[in-house]
């Protein structure tokens, strides 16, 4: 019968290997793990409690699953934009021409190519200069906004997070139909009740 000491020993022995695996690049889907959330695991007489700190993350950004006796907690912590940055994105999207429009103008045939005798070339050059001037002004406004933000300390982490917990040694004790999750104040709590009657030995009768 596995005890809480077996679980703790498993966690301690595999801690560094798990960190290497969880913080490395996954070649299958090329996902880089940027954050390794801290975790506490407690076994009581009637339940297993798993607590994981996920500050600054909403519950919609968290995915939890159990596959092949491995509990996985993963998701993405996104950086929130302030009001000034949000306004800049809105203004840029509303004033700047889309890339598809620019591509169609550059790659597709223009009216001037078919009406060289009707439309003077000076008009085309004037339009080009005007467009270049507008683009330059937009870049200058963007640079001014960026230069106004002065970051003195940057210690917060953003990106993909993932944490594994191997339940192989205690899975036979747990009632997976009783899993309960709570997420409050940045703390994810997963509670799994233990079975009333459990055994890691299966008795086989001879017919």
Curated annotation (Swiss-Prot):
Family matches, as Pfam families: HSP20 (PF00011)
The keyword Ion transport is assigned to this record: no
Keyword terms of this UniProt record: Stress response
Family to which this protein belongs: Belongs to the small heat shock protein (HSP20) family.
Protein name: Small heat shock protein hspG7
InterPro entries: A-crystallin/Hsp20_dom, HSP20-like_chaperone, HspG1-11-like
Gene: hspG7
UniProt feature, compositional bias: Low complexity: 84-101, 122-135
Residue stretches making up the sHSP domain: 30-207
Gene3D superfamilies for this protein: 2.60.40.790
Compositional bias (Basic and acidic residues): 136-149
SUPFAM superfamilies cross-referenced by the UniProt entry: HSP20-like chaperones
Region of interest: Disordered: 84-149
